[in-house]
């Protein structure tokens, strides 16, 4: 019997999302206009809370859909205007270009990145050294590339290796289903569980590595570019200004990586079983024999393009997104990718998040029009200049760990810049606050998958169910990093940021906003 029209419409609304989630969103959409008529300020804060809720529930439904519905309603009922949304999007065009073109550009360098991580995995036998190598490699790559893409590459390596061993363990060849363990011998199952633990720890080290490297440069995370633009900093300025906080945090983060592996705390310390290593090594040897001269040329070309990418970013030869576009053109032209559909695949990872970021800017427009953050900013600005840095760092860290750090960073840097333009704080203080905001959004946000887009990408990937990586397990494994990164970042903001910045300014290393 066919279902009713109403039931069909209910099933279509937000698709596979739970009924309680659909009902919650409908309640939000119904009550918002009435609350806005009664009290616009409360309605604005309610909208922000609802939007954060959609981010926190990202595993139930991709936030673009519910967040987009809330944003459309906000424009319709007058919480902001379409013109203001357009202004916010135009002001952040560089960030949208970064997400569209840089992520797509790195897609065409995946072969090189896969080659690098495969070599690391098979050539280093010590688990502690291997974990450190993955963390450092992810940090370095994320400082110049997009963290999401770096994690995507590591996921590709892990899924590939897991599939190779799973096929051998199940003896089912190409027809093997990686989610089905029913055909695996009990002995192989024990080895497989150990292999899963090994991959889980490597993925978490790599994920945290993207946060350690991503906070250091203006292209490491989308919000970094927003903050750099607001402060008028280029690549070198941004790196130097962040370094009093980010360099000590990087060192302590790497020490944490070694400690948890050595002590086998928080689910770390599992080694690669020898039986698995033998299978993977055999497969890699076969792959290397099959590699043609044309394949080798592709790797060399991608490495040269990587040098161009780093050089262009460091010397600020063009806007970041345009450098990404140049990578797409060079990588496709010189490696023989000419089919439109093959090129189109490169954009599938970035465009949903680009659309979500545009919705962020709609919510930011509401926050500005309704003056939602004015009381918080006034409270922070009433404190001493030294205390302001700590408060901005803590407020950003708390919100970023439950919400999305791009959203939080955008709001706070806009408010800090407005305070400077109104004469509430000096230029020097604004530049220090920009560092506190950037580090506050990037470091504590490793606490949950909600805060870091790369973590959320890992949690929702095809790899997570294979290696039994759940939301709770991710939070638990991230806990030592969360504690160390947050506390060291706070201490550096408190004690080293101002004196180190003053020293670099006097030495003539730093440019200031004019």
UniProtKB/Swiss-Prot annotation:
Any one Gene Ontology molecular-function term assigned to this protein's record: sodium:proton antiporter activity
InterPro entries registered for this protein in UniProt: Na+/H+_antiporter_NhaB
Topology in the lipid bilayer: Multi-pass membrane protein
Protein location: Cell inner membrane
One Pfam family cited in the UniProt record for this chain: NhaB
Any coiled-coil regions, as ranges: none
NCBIfam families attached to this UniProt entry: NhaB, PRK09547.1
Superkingdom of the organism of origin: Bacteria
Alphabetical UniProt keywords: Antiport, Cell inner membrane, Cell membrane, Ion transport, Membrane, Sodium, Sodium transport, Transmembrane, Transmembrane helix, Transport
Gene that this polypeptide is encoded by: nhaB
GO cellular component annotations of the record: plasma membrane
Protein name (Swiss-Prot/TrEMBL): Na(+)/H(+) antiporter NhaB
Family the entry assigns: Belongs to the NhaB Na(+)/H(+) (TC 2.A.34) antiporter family.
PANTHER family listed in its UniProt record: NA(+)_H(+) ANTIPORTER NHAB, TRANSPORTER ARSB-RELATED
